[in-house]
Amino acid sequence: MRGLGLTLAAACAAWLAWWAWPDGAHSEAAAARQAARGGFAPSLIGTRPDGAAAEADGKLVVDQQLRQLFDYYLATLGERDLAVIRTELQGQLKRSLKNGPLAQAMGLFDRYVGYKRSLAGKAAAAATDLSHRLELVQAARRQYFSQAELDGLFGDEDRYDNFTARRLAIEANPALSVDEKRRRVAQLEQQLPPGLRAAREEPVKHLALADAEARLRQGGGGEQQLYQLRAGMVGQAAADRLGELDREQAAWQNRVDDFKRERTAILADGGLSAQQRQQALARLQAQRFSQQESLRLPAYLSN
């Protein structure tokens, strides 16, 4: 699960993101020519496909992993024409699917594209209330997908969106007291599937941990107390990982501080010309940091 990124707001925002979807598609020959001119899409350089495709008992597995794969490629619309995107996706799917499931996947992709296009025509509904937006989105989905496909592609999102709409209705109800609103929202949360409930609680848990850590440090707490605090709030394994991250960050900061001192000495050397200073700084940075680390460096040097 990708957490609470699957939200009602995200579904509604899709209307505006897809309003400029091109009409029709280029021929396969045009798709091949465009792909040949510069690979697939610049924005995907250095990335791996998000999501995955799978089959079971000779049939396509329709789930959110497959939808994520569709969205990964469709995110390049604008950089690449739809025909190019479809051809590239088909090539990716051939690596994991046989002919039957592959045909199912491409048919599902075409309907997914149709669904996305249909949302563009409902952009005006963005001005209405969230519950109405949700109804429009779900009605559009029913026009393109079977119930089994809906459950696979959008199940968790629909459940969380319905929860969100009901929660907002409770919070907006002036007839309810603060305590009654809190009680009803808590009841709604208990109706969420365990995975969604845990995902909803996760950001709150980390915010609470960060606040507790800050109070502990302000009070003079040491590393052992910090570890005990973390283990009690997020578990021993997570506390171990956080401790390792702390050590890595401290080691990195020490390297940055050493670099700053040496850089200051170079800049203060009156015997060097401006060009010599720049060359010396470039050599120093190359000696101390890899190319990847150098990308992080400016943010720390500005402090």
Curated annotation (Swiss-Prot):
One record GO biological process: lipid catabolic process
SUPFAM superfamilies on file: Lipase chaperone-like (SSF158855)
One Pfam family of this chain: Lipase_chap
Keyword annotations: Cell inner membrane, Cell membrane, Chaperone, Lipid degradation, Lipid metabolism, Membrane, Transmembrane, Transmembrane helix
GO molecular function, one term: unfolded protein binding
Gene Ontology cellular-component terms listed: plasma membrane
Annotated localization: Cell inner membrane
Transmembrane portions of the chain: 7-23
InterPro entries: Lipase_chaperone
Primary localization class, coarse: membrane
Protein topology in the membrane: Single-pass membrane protein
Family classification: Belongs to the lipase chaperone family.
Known role: May be involved in the folding of the extracellular lipase during its passage through the periplasm.
NCBIfam families in the record: PRK01294.1-2
The protein's name in its UniProt record: Lipase chaperone
Species whose genome carries this gene: Chromobacterium violaceum (strain ATCC 12472 / DSM 30191 / JCM 1249 / CCUG 213 / NBRC 12614 / NCIMB 9131 / NCTC 9757 / MK)
